[in-house]
Amino acid sequence: MSDERYQQRQQKVKDRVDARVAQAQEERGIIIVFTGNGKGKTTAAFGTAARAVGHGKNVGVVQFIKGTWPNGERNLLEPHGVEFQVMATGFTWETQNREADTAACMAVWQHGKRMLADPLLDMVVLDELTYMVAYDYLPLEEVISALNARPGHQTVIITGRGCHRDILDLADTVSELRPVKHAFDAGVKAQMGIDY
């Protein structure tokens, strides 16, 4: 491809991108969902949260399911003023106690509702929320209501597999992560600094 043809092609791309950017003028908080069976949902959420903190935004985090071991995202973000509320019961297949898991979920959800109502928070991460709805630990209607009632500038990031259709419909941005290959399938254990 000649330099002239390359330049013409790139100019067309630039014109299309510039036109789309010019049309997108609304400023408001959005709902982002990272779902699917692939690795990286929580990683994507915390990468976005770190970006927000880097720009001086106030971020709150609620972690469902995870939380019985130290994790890098908390070690990084908490010293920068990010509030973490963690269910801290571990994986539900380990606890095998529906009543206790539901109670723990509801307790940490109270913090989530508080964060979603807080006009000082620019972003709230609800890590692994999808499981809480799927397992009927949290009423879907209560989650939808809290999301709809949040301050207009607040962005919410929801992670987890099998996100309920009503949450997907409410979301502004949905990314579905698909597994292609995973080290765990080859017998490589979860590693600090990579997986947690």
From Swiss-Prot:
User: Where is it mostly found?
Assistant: cytoplasm
Q: One GO cellular component from the entry?
A: cytoplasm
Q: Which InterPro entries match?
A: CblAdoTrfase_CobA, P-loop_NTPase
MF-aspect GO terms:
ATP binding; corrinoid adenosyltransferase activity
Q: In which pathway does it act?
A: Cofactor biosynthesis; adenosylcobalamin biosynthesis; adenosylcobalamin from cob(II)yrinate a,c-diamide: step 2/7
Q: GO biological process: any one? A: porphyrin-containing compound biosynthetic process
Asked if the record carries the keyword ATP-binding, the reply is yes
Residue positions annotated to bind ATP are G36, N37, G38, K39, G40, K41, T42
Q: What phenotype has been reported when the gene encoding this protein is knocked out?
A: Mild growth defect on 1,2-propanediol-cyanocobalamin medium; no growth is seen in a double cobA-pduO deletion.
**Cellular compartments annotated:** Cytoplasm
Keyword terms of this UniProt record: ATP-binding, Cobalamin biosynthesis, Cytoplasm, Nucleotide-binding, Porphyrin biosynthesis, Transferase
> Which top class of enzyme applies to this chain?
transferase
Q: Does the keyword Magnesium apply?
A: no
Recorded catalytic reaction(s): these are: 2 cob(II)yrinate a,c diamide + reduced [electron-transfer flavoprotein] + 2 ATP = 2 adenosylcob(III)yrinate a,c-diamide + 2 triphosphate + oxidized [electron-transfer flavoprotein] + 3 H(+); 2 cob(II)alamin + reduced [electron-transfer flavoprotein] + 2 ATP = 2 adenosylcob(III)alamin + 2 triphosphate + oxidized [electron-transfer flavoprotein] + 3 H(+)
Source domain of life? Bacteria
State the CDD domains in the record: CobA_ACA (cd00561)
Q: What is its EC number?
A: 2.5.1.17
Q: Which family does it belong to?
A: Belongs to the Cob(I)alamin adenosyltransferase family.
Quaternary data: Homodimer.
What does this chain do?
Answer: Required for both de novo synthesis of the corrin ring for the assimilation of exogenous corrinoids. Participates in the adenosylation of a variety of incomplete and complete corrinoids.
**Name of the protein in its database record:** Corrinoid adenosyltransferase CobA
- Organism of origin: Salmonella typhimurium (strain LT2 / SGSC1412 / ATCC 700720)
